[in-house]
Amino acid sequence: MTATSDKVLKIQLRSASATVPTKGSATAAGYDIYASQDITIPAMGQGMVSTDISFTVPVGTYGRIAPRSGLAVKNGIQTGAGVVDRDYTGEVKVVLFNHSQRDFAIKKGDRVAQLILEKIVDDAQIVVVDSLEESARGAGGFGSTGN
C-alpha cells in the first residue's frame, strides 16, 4: 500500500528522549503523546510538557492536542492550547492545568495528551449578512438544550 500525502502523518523525533505517538487501540480516535522528560505540575498551577517531537499533519487536517480522560478524571489534569496547524514545524509541547490540591508528577515516557487529526475547510468563504436563519435553538447558549 502506497502512502499518499493526504494520509501521511510525518513525525520528527527531535531527541533520543522522544517517543513516536501511538494508538491505544486499532479504532482509537487519537494518538497518545508522551512526555520526553520529568516535570511536576504544581497544585492549582500549570506547566508545559516537552515531547521532543515535531509533526506535519496530513493535507486538509490540523492536529488537536486533546486531554486524556484518565488524567482528567483521576487527577484533575486538563489540557490547554491545543491547535497545531499544518505549517507549524517546531516542537509540540503540551500545556497542562492541574486543578487538584496536590502537585502532579509526570515522568519521562508518561502519556500526557492525545493528538487527534481533524478535517478542516481550507477555502470557506466569509459572507457578512444582516441576520442569520432561524433555528430551533436560536441564541440559547450554555445549558440551553437541557441537562
Curated annotation (Swiss-Prot):
Binding-site residues for dUMP, renumbered to this chain: S69, G82, D85, Y88, K93, R137, F142, G143
Pathway: Pyrimidine metabolism; dUMP biosynthesis; dUMP from dCTP (dUTP route): step 2/2
GO CC annotation: cytoplasm; nucleus
Effect on the protein upon substituting S69A: Exhibits negligible activity
GO molecular function annotation: dITP diphosphatase activity; dUTP diphosphatase activity; magnesium ion binding
Cofactor(s) this protein requires: Mg(2+)
Description of the deletion phenotype: Leads to dTMP auxotrophy.
Protein role: Involved in nucleotide metabolism via production of dUMP, the immediate precursor of thymidine nucleotides, and decreases the intracellular concentration of dUTP so that uracil cannot be incorporated into DNA. Shows a significant activity against dITP, another potentially mutagenic nucleotide.
Similarity remark: Belongs to the dUTPase family.
General remark: Present with 4340 molecules/cell in log phase SD medium. Each trimer binds three substrate molecules. The ligands are bound between subunits, and for each substrate molecule, residues from adjacent subunits contribute to the binding interactions.
Cited NCBIfam families: dut (TIGR00576), PRK00601.1 (NF001862)
Annotated protein name in UniProt: Deoxyuridine 5'-triphosphate nucleotidohydrolase
UniProt organism field: Saccharomyces cerevisiae (strain ATCC 204508 / S288c)
